[in-house]
C-alpha cells in the first residue's frame, strides 16, 4: 500500500470539522482504502482529488473538558501533529472561544504547516469578518462554508497541489511524460497513441486540469504515457490554477523516465520552456525536444537545421538532447520518436563499472592539464536512471568548470550521449597512517 501524505483536521467541537471532512472527500467521487476508527479515534480516508491522492484525517473536538474521553481525544490530536504533513485548523468565523486560543497556542511550533480554515462563511457578507483573524499569525487561510459548499473547490485544489501524490502503475518498460503549453499538440498526440492503430492496454482519463494516462504496446515494449494539461505562463504568481499547472507538470516529470517537451513549431520558445528544461536536467530524466504541427510549416531548405541551432542557443543546458519534428495528422516523425525513446531508456539504464571508469579517467587526465593544486582521485557511478557519478578530488574549492565539462563530454562518448549526466564532486580526505 502506498504511503500518502497526511492532512489533519483539528478544531474545537462544533466548528464543522466533520462536515468539512466530508466535503473535502466529496463522496460523489471515488474514494479508496478507507480506514475507520471509533468516535474517540481518528477517522482516516484516502481522498482522491482528480488523480491526486492524500490521506485526510478527522479528529475529535479539542476541548478543555477534563473527563477521560475528552483527555484521550486531545492526546490523540496532539500526538498526531508531529506525524502529519499539513494541519487544517478549523475555526467558526462567527466566534472565537477560549478553546480555540488553546489550540492555537499548541499549534505555534507547527505554524509552517498550519492552514487556517474559517468555516460557516455562509454568505458573502461574512467574508468581511476574516480580518479579525489576521492577528492569529497564520499566513495561509481559506474562507469556506462546509454546509453550503462555498470555497470547497478552491481548498481541494490547494490540497492536491500541496500534498497530492500520484503514482504510475508498475509494469511499463518506458514511462513518458508529455509536457508543453496549451495547444502545443499534446492532446492530438495522446489521442493518436490511444487510437485504433495501437493496442491499448489501459486508459485513465482526467479532466482538463488534470492529466490523461495511457498505456499501450509498441514493438513489444509497454509504454506508459502521461499527458498533462498545458503549462501556462504565470500572469499572477498567487493564482492557484497557474501554480497548480506547473506543480502538476513537475510531479509528472518526477514519475517518468523520459519527457517529451512539446513545442508548437509556430510559437516562440519561452522562459517557461527553459524552466521545465532545467528541472528535467536537474532530475536526470531523458528529454526529447519535439516540434509539433510540422505539417503547418512551409519548410524551406535548411529550416530544420536552423531551428535546431536556435534551440541549442536558447537551451544550452540541453545541447545533448535529441530534437524531432512531428505531425500527427500527416504521420511525420512518430516512428522515429518511439525509436529514440528506446535509445534513451537504454542509456538511462547503462552502468559502467568502477574499474573501467577509472581506466578511462586516467587516459582523460593525461590529455587535460589540471591546475597543480587540483588532483583527481577516482570516479564511480552510483546510480542509473538517473545516471549519476561521484568524482573524488583532493579538493573541490575552485574546481575548474572547464574540467567538469571535459569530463561530461568524455562520459558521453562511452554511451551516455543523449541524456543528462549528474556528476557530484566530493573531497577525498587523505588516509591517516
UniProtKB/Swiss-Prot annotation:
Q: Which family does it belong to?
A: Belongs to the TRAFAC class TrmE-Era-EngA-EngB-Septin-like GTPase superfamily. EngA (Der) GTPase family.
Q: Which organism is it from?
A: Borreliella burgdorferi (strain ATCC 35210 / DSM 4680 / CIP 102532 / B31) (Borrelia burgdorferi)
Q: Return one Gene Ontology term, BP aspect.
A: ribosome biogenesis
Q: How does it assemble?
A: Associates with the 50S ribosomal subunit.
| PANTHER family the record matches | GTPASE DER
Q: Where is the EngA-type G domain?
A: 5-167, 174-349
Note the Pfam families from the entry.
KH_dom-like, MMR_HSR1
Q: Which UniProt keywords apply?
A: GTP-binding, Nucleotide-binding, Repeat, Ribosome biogenesis
Annotated GTP 1 binding lies at 11-18, 58-62, 119-122
Q: What GO molecular function annotation could you give as one example from this UniProt entry?
A: GTP binding
Q: Which InterPro entries match?
A: G_ENGA, GTP-bd, GTPase_Der, KH_dom-like, KH_dom-like_a/b, P-loop_NTPase, Small_GTP-bd
Query: At the top level of its lineage, which domain of life is listed?
Result: Bacteria
- UniProt-annotated binding residues for GTP 2: 180-187, 227-231, 292-295
The name under which this protein is listed is GTPase Der
* Described function: GTPase that plays an essential role in the late steps of ribosome biogenesis.
| Record domain KH-like: where | 349-429
Amino acid at each position: 500500500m502506498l504511503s500518502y501524505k497526511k492532512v489533519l483536521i483539528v478544531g474545537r467541537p462544533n466548528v464543522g470539522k466533520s462536515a468539512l471532512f466530508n466535503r473535502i472527500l466529496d463522496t460523489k467521487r471515488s474514494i479508496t482504502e478507507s480506514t475507520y476508527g471509533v468516535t474517540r479515534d481518528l477517522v482516516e480516508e484516502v481522498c482522491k482529488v482528480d488523480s491526486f491522492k492524500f490521506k485526510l484525517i478527522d479528529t475529535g473536538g479539542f476541548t478543555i473538558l477534563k473527563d477521560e474521553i475528552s483527555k484521550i481525544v486531545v492526546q490523540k490530536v496532539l500526538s498526531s501533529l508531529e506525524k502529519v504533513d499539513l494541519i487544517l485548523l478549523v475555526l467558526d468565523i462567527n466566534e472565537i472561544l477560549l478553546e480555540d486560543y488553546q489550540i492555537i497556542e499548541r499549534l505555534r511550533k507547527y505554524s509552517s504547516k498550519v492552514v487556517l480554515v474559517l468555516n460557516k462563511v455562509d454568505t458573502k457578507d461574512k467574508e468581511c469578518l476574516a480580518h479579525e483573524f489576521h492577528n492569529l499569525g497564520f499566513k495561509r487561510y481559506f474562507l469556506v462554508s462546509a454546509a453550503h459548499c462555498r470555497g470547497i473547490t478552491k481548498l481541494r485544489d490547494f490540497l492536491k497541489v500541496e500534498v497530492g501524490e500520484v503514482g504510475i502503475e508498475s509494469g511499463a518498460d518506458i514511462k513518458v511524460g508529455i509536457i508543453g503549453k496549451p495547444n502545443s499538440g499534446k492532446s492530438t498526440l495522446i489521442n493518436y497513441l490511444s487510437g485504433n492503430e495501437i493496442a491499448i492496454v489501459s486508459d485513465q482519463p482526467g479532466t482538463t486540469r488534470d492529466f490523461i494516462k495511457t498505456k499501450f504496446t509498441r514493438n513489444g515494449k509497454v509504454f506508459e504515457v502521461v499527458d498533462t494539461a498545458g503549462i501556462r505562463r504565470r500572469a499572477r504568481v498567487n493564482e492557484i490554477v497557474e501554480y497548480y499547472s506547473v506543480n502538476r507538470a513537475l510531479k509528472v516529470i518526477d514519475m517518468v523516465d523520459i519527457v517529451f517537451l512539446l513545442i508548437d513549431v509556430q510559437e516562440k520558445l519561452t522562459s517557461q520552456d527553459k524552466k521545465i528544461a532545467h528541472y528535467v536536467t536537474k532530475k536526470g530524466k531523458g528529454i526529447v525536444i519535439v516540434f509539433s504541427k510540422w505539417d503547418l510549416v512551409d519548410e524551406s531548405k535548411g529550416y530544420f537545421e536552423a531551428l535546431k541551432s536556435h534551440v541549442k542557443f536558447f537551451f544550452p543546458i540541453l545541447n545533448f538532447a535529441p530534437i524531432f519534428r512531428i505531425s500527427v495528422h500527416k504521420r511525420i516523425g512518430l516512428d522515429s520518436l518511439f525509436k529514440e525513446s528506446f535509445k534513451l531508456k537504454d542509456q538511462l539504464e547503462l552502468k559502467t563499472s568502477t574499474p573501467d571508469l577509472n581506466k578511462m579517467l586516467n587516459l582523460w587526465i593525461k590529455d587535460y592539464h589540471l591546475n597543480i593544486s587540483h588532483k583527481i582521485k577516482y570516479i564511480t557511478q552510483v546510480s542509473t536512471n538517473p545516471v549519476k557519478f561521484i568524482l573524488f578530488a583532493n579538493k573541490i574549492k575552485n574546481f575548474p568548470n572547464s574540467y567538469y565539462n571535459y569530463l561530461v563530454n568524455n562520459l558521453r562518448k562511452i554511451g551516455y550521449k543523449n541524456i543528462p549526466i549528474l556528476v557530484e564532486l566530493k573531497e577525498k580526505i587523505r588516509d591517516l597512517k
